[in-house]
């Protein structure tokens, strides 16, 4: 909702095959951030044939939006490259502007979301272990065993892979003598 983009949930084999009873999730604990949702009262009157700038070029890449049917919130939406009002636009300058806007949105997501769980305890580690999904429990168990043996092991658990948090991960990679990627498949 907030970033106006689809979310793809990628469970792994363990999650897909696991059967476990868990308490019902309290949906009231998680507020839904609708993002830049316009209110009808805030929409300026549109003189026909004007449209609301649904795809306005913004600094953070996220445009204000309306709910279909809102007075003065009329916009077009196509699968073609478009201008700020949603009208098809083939001009190279608009294509570049809209593409740049989409990439700014990815940067906004990366800046506002914690892309990985940081279990790094050491400034410099013998080993950095990076995992995702259900590998977490096994990794935490292994890290605890290595701690008892005096091996300095840091652990990062990825939560977001697009946009991939390369800039945020690099300092951890640089501070480790060896990096181990734990995944739950053949590769």
Model-derived features with residue positions:
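Flexible, low-complexity linker and terminal segments
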Residues: 1-187
């Amino acid at each position: 909702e907030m970033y106006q983009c689809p979310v793809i949930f990628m469970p792994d084999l363990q999650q897909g095959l696991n059967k476990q009873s868990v308490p019902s999730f309290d949906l009231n604990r998680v507020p839904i951030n609708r993002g830049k949702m316009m209110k009808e009262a805030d929409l300026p009157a549109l003189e026909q044939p004007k449209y609301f700038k649904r795809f306005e070029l913004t600094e953070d890449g996220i445009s204000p939006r309306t709910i279909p049917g809102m007075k003065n919130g009329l916009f077009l939406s196509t699968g073609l490259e478009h201008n700020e009002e949603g009208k098809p636009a083939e001009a190279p300058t608009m294509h570049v502007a809209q593409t740049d806007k989409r990439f700014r949105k990815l940067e906004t997501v990366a800046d506002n979301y914690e892309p990985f769980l940081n279990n790094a305890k050491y400034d410099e580690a013998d080993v950095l272990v990076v995992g995702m999904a259900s590998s977490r429990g096994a990794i935490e168990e292994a890290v605890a065993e290595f701690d008892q043996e005096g091996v300095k092991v840091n652990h990062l658990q990825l939560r977001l892979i697009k946009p991939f948090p390369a800039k945020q991960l690099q300092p951890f990679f640089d501070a480790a003598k060896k990096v181990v990627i734990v995944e739950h498949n053949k590769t």
